[in-house]
């Protein structure tokens, strides 16, 4: 491979025209990026990043909807070589608005946080606190002030939400009945 003036390396040649083309480039911060063009339109369909050039891929970005934007990103946040976070830009505005996380490094995703209204703030927080694959905690900020307006929990982990906490009694539909 030869390096070009723009920092891009010559692409690795695919065995035939149906195989993806992979190009190695160096990012503006010195990281190594492997970009894959699966459909030969000269737009990356996926990219793998070695952010610290230690030979281990730290994150992968994927264009999951074919629009030319790498809206889905998988990351190894703790450096153990396993993906423990998935970030998605669901509305195409260039900002990730959904995160799925493995918060304790056990290989199971146990938290989902979402910006449902696109204001850049998390307004929905869903957690699996006992690692059974089911949500045990859901918090929601309805008015965009950055504070939870209500929290619903399954405190005894039987699969049924049994506790509801409203931050403001005037938003509690049970108090208004």
Regions found by a protein language model. Name each.
Residues 1-177:
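Calcium-binding acidic motifs and repeat modules
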């Amino acid at each position: 491979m030869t390096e070009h003036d723009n920092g891009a390396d010559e692409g690795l040649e695919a065995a035939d025209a149906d195989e993806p083309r992979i190009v190695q480039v160096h990012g503006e911060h010195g990281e190594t990026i492997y970009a894959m063009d699966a459909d030969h339109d000269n737009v990356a369909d996926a990219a793998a990043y070695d952010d610290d050039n230690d030979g281990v891929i730290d994150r992968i970005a994927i264009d999951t909807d074919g629009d030319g934007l790498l809206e889905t990103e998988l990351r190894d946040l703790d450096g153990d070589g396993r993906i423990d976070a998935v970030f998605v830009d669901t509305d195409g505005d260039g900002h990730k608005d959904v995160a799925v996380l493995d918060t304790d490094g056990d290989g199971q995703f146990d938290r989902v946080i979402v910006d449902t209204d696109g204001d850049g703030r998390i307004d929905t927080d869903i957690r699996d606190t006992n690692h059974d694959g089911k949500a045990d905690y859901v918090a929601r900020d309805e008015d965009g002030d950055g504070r939870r307006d209500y929290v619903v929990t399954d405190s005894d982990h039987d699969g049924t939400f049994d506790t509801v906490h409203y931050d403001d009694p005037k938003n509690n539909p049970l108090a208004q009945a």
